């Protein structure tokens, strides 16, 4: 098949996954705001950061990239720490989701040979355009957290500790 068609197909897939990531973020925000009070919403997103970070360990196991375990595990541990901080500090969620979006893009760029900050095999493989989907979701969520931070801080202060 012609290289032009291959590139066109890839661009269409990337655009679709980015749009789906944005739609997933919008749906998540809509449902969480409707179902959870502000304090619980913040805690939900903090725990969700931990879960989405753990996907990379699942990918490492699935794709059998043994050399990636050390780095991927260390990064997941860092996201767990950020997530735990994010349960109380909105700024940690903003930073955590932004960093996770960058982590997703690094994986996507390495998967396509466009850029690699690490040696071959240090990062796990990911499904096609997963990094684009997840980065779109993560960056949208970080922007939402920035907009929501004052309300979360007020809710935390209103509840006796």
Each language-model region and where it sits:
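Functional transmembrane or membrane-interface alpha-helices that line membrane-embedded catalytic
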Residues: 2-10, 16, 20, 33, ...
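Transmembrane alpha-helical segments of multi-pass membrane transport proteins and ion-pumping complexes
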Residues: 22-29
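Membrane-interface helix caps and helix-loop-helix hairpins in membrane proteins
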Residues: 36-39, 59-68, 87, 124
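A generic, lipid-embedded transmembrane alpha helix
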Residues: 48-62
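Hydrophobic core segments of alpha-helical transmembrane domains in multi-pass membrane proteins
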Residues: 71-77, 95-98
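Catalytic glutamate of the conserved HExxH
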Residues: 97, 101, 105
